[in-house]
Amino acid sequence: MTTLFDILNTLNNNNNNNNNYAGCKRQHSINKRVDIIPSMDVTLTNDKLIIETELTGVSKNDIDINIKDSILIIQGEKKKSIIKHQQQQQHQQQQQQQQQQQQQQQQQQQQQQQQQQQQQQQLENSNKENDEPSIEEFEEDVKSKSELNKTTLNTTENKDEDKTTQNISKKFISERSFGNFKRYLNLSEILYQLDLNSINTQFENGLLTITIKKKFDSSNTIKININ
């Protein structure tokens, strides 16, 4: 007569063998590389089977659970979504600031160009009247050119500052693991005892809990009547 201890032992052995087999198989069937092997606890009580899997940092939308050929498969991906989102926000803010600075610089340049054009027209008009330009006009022309040179220098300095600020962030310690994961659990030894219609899943604080209730009549013998 088999006991709960025997069933759990066979579950554990079959699970290890199946994981080894699946590891070879998934290289051919799945292009994605498996980077993480999450920890799993399996508990068999008098009325249910409880499977607990640690999936810290994984989103609920990135977890896929199914049963195929008496094998429970838990797979998914642990993404760098939070870090990427923060980096994207920072990048967008930097781009917006750069665009605002460029727009301001363009407006300043347009205003200065308009002032130059007006000054040139005034100079041309004055030159028509007098062949030699006045001292005041000459000084204004020199001032406008010097202001233009200053603005171009400021724009190049701002661009250099933007490049330096973008490359400030550095990662000193990187110990977290990200990527795809996949776990197999062979249920062939106790599948006849389980009511698959009663499967309940719960995901809270990074712990995935799958509960499968047992059938009321869990005997593996089927009575066949003779007609």
UniProtKB/Swiss-Prot annotation:
Residues 31-227 form the sHSP domain. Keywords: Stress response. It comes from the Eukaryota. InterPro entries: A-crystallin/Hsp20_dom, HSP20-like_chaperone, HspG1-11-like. CDD domains: ACD_sHsps-like. Residues 119-164 are annotated as: Disordered. Belongs to the small heat shock protein (HSP20) family. PANTHER family: HEAT SHOCK PROTEIN DDB_G0288861-RELATED. This is Small heat shock protein hspG3. It comes from Dictyostelium discoideum (Social amoeba).
